[in-house]
């Protein structure tokens, strides 16, 4: 029975490796199989992912070409209507840009000019204040809280008054 064992050649790393076990064709040092085109599992995965990406790009490219042809014909027909609208929207966008900058500018306390960033407190008088000046008496607020409170209560609690009857008195 000892004579039936086969001796390992010097170039093989394990005894019993059959004809199906060959080194990976990419030269990474692992064994490949015929099912994976003589590549190891890692190299085969990378190779198939690359092929899939190339096929998807080609498919997307052909779709874009078909869509591009259809779009150019419709764009030529609509070009005269689109140009005046684009000019009007660009002028309105230019007018909105300074207003947007002015809205983001108050990052400082209105009383002491200290940077407040996101931690600032907005008052009803319209100012942005730090923690020390957030109360109305600390920054000399001109907002009339008393009348605003009265108006708010009047809106929330409407007075129910019955109509006077002419026959009754």
From Swiss-Prot:
A zinc finger (A20-type) spans 18-52. Zn(2+) 1 binds at residues 24, 28, 40, 43. InterPro entries: AN1-like_Znf, AN1_A20_ZnFinger, Znf_A20, Znf_AN1. Zn(2+) 2 binds at residues 109, 112, 130, 133. The keyword Zinc-finger applies. Induction: By dehydration and salt stress. Zn(2+) 3 binds at residues 123, 125, 139, 141. One of its GO terms (molecular function) is zinc ion binding. It holds the Pfam family zf-AN1. The keyword Metal-binding applies. A zinc finger (AN1-type) spans 103-149. PROSITE patterns: ZF_A20, ZF_AN1. Keywords: Metal-binding, Stress response, Zinc, Zinc-finger. May be involved in environmental stress response. This is Zinc finger A20 and AN1 domain-containing stress-associated protein 7. It comes from Oryza sativa subsp. japonica (Rice). The gene is SAP7.
């Amino acid at each position: 029975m000892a004579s039936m064992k086969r001796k390992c050649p010097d170039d093989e790393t394990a005894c019993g490796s059959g004809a199906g076990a060959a080194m990976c064709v990419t030269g990474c040092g692992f064994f490949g199989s015929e099912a994976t085109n003589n590549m190891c599992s890692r190299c085969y995965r990378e190779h198939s992912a690359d092929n899939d990406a190339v096929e998807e790009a080609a498919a997307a490219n052909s779709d874009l070409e078909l869509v591009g042809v259809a779009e150019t014909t419709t764009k030529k027909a609509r070009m005269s209507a689109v140009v005046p609208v684009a000019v009007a929207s660009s002028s309105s966008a230019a007018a909105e840009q300074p207003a947007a900058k002015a809205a983001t500018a108050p990052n400082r306390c209105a009383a002491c000019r200290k940077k407040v960033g996101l931690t600032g407190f907005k008052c009803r008088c319209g100012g942005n204040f730090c923690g020390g000046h957030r109360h109305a008496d600390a920054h000399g607020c001109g907002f009339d809280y008393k009348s605003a409170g009265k108006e708010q209560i009047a809106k929330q609690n409407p007075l129910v008054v019955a109509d006077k009857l002419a026959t009754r008195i």
